[in-house]
Amino acid sequence: VGFKAGVREYKLTYYTPEYETKDTDILAAFRVTPQPGVPPEEAGAAVAAESSTGTWTTVWTDGLTSLDRYKGRCYHIEPVPGEADQYMSYVAYPLDLFEEGSVTNMFTSIVGNVFGFKALRALRLEDLRIPPAYIKTFQGPPHGIQVERDKLNKYGRPTLGCTIKPKLGLSAKNYGRAVYECLRGGLDFTKDDENVNSQPFMRWRDRFLFCAEAIYKAQAETGEIKGHYLNATAGTCEEMIKRAVFARELGVPIIMHDYLTGGFTANTSLAHYCRDNGLLLHIHRAMHAVIDRQKNHGIHFRVLAKALRMSGGDHIHSGTVVGKLEGERDITLGFVVLLRDDYIEKDRSRGIYFTQDWVSLPGVIPVASGGIHVWHMPALTEISGDDSVLQFGGGTLGHPWGNAPGAVANRVALEACVQARNEGRDLAREGNAIIC
């Protein structure tokens, strides 16, 4: 009796097709492309092993713990229809592998090490099922959809936004002027672009002050609550929180964070600050396409969206289906419902691999942004629904008469589309006629 050293095939330990998943397991759906000559069972088991308790060889200390309790298990494999040498590999992870309330730890475990594994030609994480027992360890969005509507006193329609352009180079005063013109023209929000932080041409404190002035002036003249997504993203968490504190002192309703470049730890810290201090939190997904664009490698955005809902954010950019940035309608709507709804049934046609119960975690408002303009309004109103932000940057500031007329055009088009929808008219068929 004793320790038997040596290398074992992963599938002998980690491929368990007889395993019945538990309600407390985190479930993952991986698209696996094995190297030539590697059986799919071995590839799937390798993913389960390397993202949980395994390493490349048997180790003496395996005998000091219970692998049956802690190991990840590849419990099902199926070929991907229409794709040669690609397989969906389903892995179950025991909940005890993960720190409570930490998206950072969850991702470090599940995707931190396996993507460079030499037995795999490519690997993509398509979806995660997060069990209620784990969700209950997260605060989630600072406020959620209903609380945001109540704070802003805006009901029965999507809200309208605009990213200030040019994104870089404006002085703080000219930037604030553009914010005022857009809000005065009828928009609900304006927005810092994702790479506007605190550069030599416009330091963050100056921008915050001039934008706050624009917000209060526009509110006084319109009688509506307005906001500007003040980007608090910074080089350190301490600096980020300092900017959030200043925004709160100015009395503005909403700030912003780039959650992928800033990181999940920073984002969760900021979300907690926002809930404690009554600030809404807008999330930009800068860098997402580096991670999710390839069809056979990386992480699908629906996983990043779920992670954001856990980490915390009241808005997140979600694609448009129309416009300049890539998005497929059914797939985009799939992760939109994962952001907004409380209980989502499995639906492979929309890319939803698992039934997800959010157990009343607040919802996130999807933001449609990127190359959209006033003629897209009927489609956006129909596709996105009321609980959304429709964000027109060039589609507002590019109006031939200027910023304020561009904002007026967007607001009038939205009001017309909402009224037509409420009257029972078909936006898909009559869209252009409605806003002419």
Swiss-Prot record:
Example of a GO cellular component annotation carried by this entry: chloroplast
Enzyme Commission designation: 4.1.1.39
Keyword annotations of the record: Calvin cycle, Carbon dioxide fixation, Chloroplast, Disulfide bond, Lyase, Magnesium, Metal-binding, Methylation, Monooxygenase, Oxidoreductase, Photorespiration, Photosynthesis, Plastid
An annotated GO BP: photorespiration
GO molecular function: magnesium ion binding; monooxygenase activity; ribulose-bisphosphate carboxylase activity
Cited InterPro entries: RuBisCO, RuBisCo_large_chain_AS, RuBisCO_lsu_C, RuBisCO_lsu_C_sf, RuBisCO_lsu_fd_N, RuBisCO_lsu_N_sf, RuBisCO_lsuI
Residues marked Transition state stabilizer (site): K324
Cofactor, free-text remark: Binds 1 Mg(2+) ion per subunit.
Entry comment on modification after translation: The disulfide bond which can form in the large chain dimeric partners within the hexadecamer appears to be associated with oxidative stress and protein turnover.
Residues the entry annotates as binding substrate: N113, T163, K167, R285, H317, S369
Enzyme class: lyase
CDD domains attached to this UniProt entry: RuBisCO_large_I
A Pfam family this chain is assigned to: RuBisCO_large_N
Family: Belongs to the RuBisCO large chain family. Type I subfamily.
Miscellaneous: The basic functional RuBisCO is composed of a large chain homodimer in a 'head-to-tail' conformation. In form I RuBisCO this homodimer is arranged in a barrel-like tetramer with the small subunits forming a tetrameric 'cap' on each end of the 'barrel'.
This protein's name: Ribulose bisphosphate carboxylase large chain
Organism: Byblis liniflora
